A protein has these predicted regions:
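Glycine-rich phosphate-binding loop of actin/hexokinase-like ATP-binding domains
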Residues: 116-172
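Glycine-rich phosphate-binding loop and adjoining helix at the ATP-binding site
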Residues: 16-118
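ATP-binding/phosphotransfer module of carbohydrate and carboxylate kinases, centering on a glycine-rich
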Residues: 1-53, 112-113, 156-160, 165-224
Length: 224
């Protein structure tokens, strides 16, 4: 499995000032993390040459982070359950922390919209995910897993999810479910725009599942 590492430098106003992307064959081991941190260190050094000071590094992870922020308590997607921050950051020259990627996205929403008070953020990416905002702040809950909407049961006894349960939202609302074997997502929408009936039906069914998920969320959390 090949992973894409995206390093983004954010200034204190929340503006992206530089980006670097690299691909690495993924392994949940020390060698992989050292190579990754080498990329980050090089990126930070280039920023320093341009007059910037790097204050720290946030690892945005597809996994549930422990309450103390020191380990991954549930990491099925990356197969890294139990990964500790000191292992992840080995060889890194800067202070660091771990955060669930959806929580990081929600914090960005708050940064750019100071009027945002109560909301559920829904991110329909390859692996759908969410985050909860209450009274203008990210609300992660005692186990740091508030907003894990992708694992609500949408269809009882339905498709098997990577988490081991059946019928999770992820298995019905992931954009991957729109594609047939060998089809790309842009390819799907290209055919959809041409009005092909089977693609229209598939997209309509997907929208129904997404709407059902939103309805379930709103029945629990009264947000607008």
């Amino acid at each position: 499995q090949t992973t894409r590492i995206t390093a983004i430098a954010i200034d204190l106003n929340g503006k992206s000032v530089a980006t670097r992307q690299r691909t690495l064959p993924y392994r949940n081991n020390d060698a992989y993390y050292q190579r990754m941190n080498g990329i980050i260190n090089d990126f930070a050094q280039e920023l320093a040459k341009q007059g910037s000071t790097v204050r720290g590094v946030a690892f945005c992870m597809q996994g549930i982070v422990s309450a103390d922020g020191q380990s991954i308590t549930f990491g099925k997607i990356m197969n890294n359950t139990g990964l500790k921050l000191n292992e992840l950051s080995h060889g890194l020259n800067y202070p660091s922390l771990m955060i669930h990627d959806s929580d990081a996205s929600a914090m960005a929403e708050l940064w750019f919209d100071h009027n945002l008070k109560d909301a559920v953020c829904i991110y329909l990416e390859r692996r759908p995910r969410g985050a909860v905002i209450v009274d203008g702040s990210l609300y992660q809950g005692p186990n740091q897993c508030n907003g894990s909407i992708e694992h609500m049961t949408l269809i009882p006894g339905g498709n098997t999810c990577y988490c081991g349960q059946q019928g999770c939202m992820d298995t019905y609302c992931s954009p991957e479910t729109l594609m047939e074997d060998g089809e790309s997502l842009p390819g799907f929408f290209s055919v959809l725009e041409q009005g092909e009936q089977e693609h229209r039906e598939r997209f309509s069914q997907w929208l129904d599942y997404v709407a059902l998920a939103v309805t379930n969320i709103r029945s629990v959390l009264a947000v607008t």
